[in-house]
A protein has these predicted regions:
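Cell-envelope/extracellular polymer assembly enzymes that use nucleotide-activated donors
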Residues: 40-43, 73, 224
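Long helical/loop segments within the catalytic core of UDP-sugar-dependent glycosyltransferases
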Residues: 98-100, 104-123, 139-218, 260, ...
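N-proximal low-complexity "stem/linker" segments adjacent to membrane-targeting elements
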Residues: 1-60
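Membrane-embedded multi-pass helical conduit in multi-pass membrane proteins
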Residues: 24-28, 34-36, 295-380
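Short beta-strand-to-loop acidic/aromatic patch adjacent to the donor-nucleotide binding site
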Residues: 122-136
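Acidic helix N-cap motif at the loop->helix transition within catalytic regions
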Residues: 56, 83-91, 98, 140
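Short, acidic, metal-binding catalytic loop of nucleotide-sugar glycosyltransferases
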Residues: 60-71
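A conserved acidic beta->alpha catalytic loop
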Residues: 78-86, 101-103, 136
Length: 396
């Protein structure tokens, strides 16, 4: 049993050390630089379901980009809305596509519907960006996001971050977004590895969308489509500095539901796609695809920490009662040590504010809650577009 405990602990140690490696590598990341005047014609798609409260400021931020105005347009998809999303978006200066197909709900289906219409135009755009309706884009977002495509990439991903409203809960979640959506993709870029799509702040060339139609409809459609592209040999490139920010969920309950969608969705994709990715990696002898499989297998950070702590505790008990040898705890100790080192190193690499460090005082409670959420995470199968609770505006 000592060997079994050590082997399982070694897997968790590998997960922790892998993330620590990415955090260290992130120090070497440099954002893409302009090599000339922009040339790509871009349509920015904004899928929106009942977002009348926030769609106006999103469109305004996109209309204020430093990218040449004649080269881009903002198109809002008012998807199965029961409020005034479409009217607010038009008043803010966006073109609007209204979709009423209640039998085919979901962000992925809305994107496929709109992309098909864009590509059917006589003069389709060179590239299509996707921005969430509750986001605010930094002025240089689009200009920075397009640079990888100007350099020959076929898809790109910017930084999808959260606003820190000053509360401890928001600071904690904003810090987590820094790690997942800035540090890890930056580290992977430095190591020559592809970037996972994050759902918000994505960009695709017209050719990619024609050759690889959007057929990702799960709660984590971004990760699902990432895998489809990677298996097709297309590597999304990270565009650090192309920032879109969204508000944190306004309540603990809303945050819990949001995390369930994201984390449960990732576990569901891992269950259904890990075998395909591994098979593709070995068939093509592709080490990058093997890394993608490993990254897909890494549990969400809170769950990873909870499981590592539990494994360490159980191993320590087994040693204490003489059931396990003392050396069995070594890999578990490595795992439990690598995780906080990853967080602190990642915060430093990301230039995290002091509030992110202070918010770590919430980590023990967060980890305990993760243990209680394991059954729900494993059962998660949501495919409908579940809108996050807002402080204002109608909800579904």
């Amino acid at each position: 049993m000592g060997v079994v405990a050590a082997v399982v602990g070694s897997v968790f140690a590998g997960f922790g050390l892998y993330q620590l490696l990415l955090a260290v590598a992130a120090f070497g990341y440099r954002p893409p630089q302009a090599t000339g005047s922009p040339t790509k014609r871009v349509t920015v798609l904004v899928p929106a379901h009942d977002e009348e409260a926030l769609i106006g400021r999103c469109v305004e931020s996109l209309n204020a980009q430093s990218y040449p105005r004649e080269l881009y347009e903002v198109v809002v998809i008012a998807d199965n809305c029961t409020d005034d999303t479409a009217e607010v978006a038009r008043k803010a200066g966006a073109a609007v596509l209204v979709r009423n197909e209640p039998e085919a709900r979901g962000k992925g289906r809305a994107l496929r519907w709109a992309i098909d219409r864009l590509l059917a135009r006589e003069w389709p755009p060179d590239a299509v960006a996707v921005v969430d309706a509750d986001s605010v884009a930094a002025p240089g977002f689009l200009e920075t996001l397009v640079r990888p495509l100007e350099e020959g990439a076929l898809a790109a991903q910017g930084e999808s971050l959260l606003f820190d409203d000053g509360s401890a809960a928001a600071a904690f979640r904003a810090g987590a977004f820094l790690l997942v959506n800035r540090v890890r993709p930056a580290g992977r870029a430095v190591l020559g590895l592809p970037c996972n799509l994050q759902g918000n702040g994505m960009l695709f060339s017209r050719g990619v969308l024609r050759a690889n139609p959007w057929e990702a409809y799960s709660a984590t459609e971004d990760l699902e489509y990432s895998i489809s592209l990677l298996l097709a040999g297309i590597e999304p490139r990270f565009a650090g500095g192309a920032i879109v920010q969204s508000p944190a969920a306004p309540s603990a309950e809303a945050a819990s539901h949001q995390q369930l969608r994201w984390e449960g969705g990732k576990l569901n994709v891992a269950r259904t796609q890990l075998g395909r990715v591994l098979a593709g990696a070995f068939r093509r002898r592709d080490p990058k695809l093997l890394e993608v499989a490993f990254d897909l297998a890494v549990p969400p950070l809170g769950l990873l920490t909870a499981l590592a702590a539990t494994g360490t505790g159980l191993t320590a008990i087994g040693i204490g009662v003489g059931y396990l040898p003392a050396w069995a705890i070594v890999p578990w100790g490595v795992a439990l040590g690598a995780i906080p080192l990853y967080v602190l190193t990642g915060f430093r690499a990301a230039g995290a504010p002091a509030s992110a460090y202070r918010s770590l005082a919430r980590a023990p409670v967060f980890v305990l809650k993760k243990l209680g959420a394991v059954p729900r995470l494993l059962r998660f199968r949501a495919e409908s577009w579940v809108r996050t609770e807002r402080e204002s505006g109608r909800d579904r």
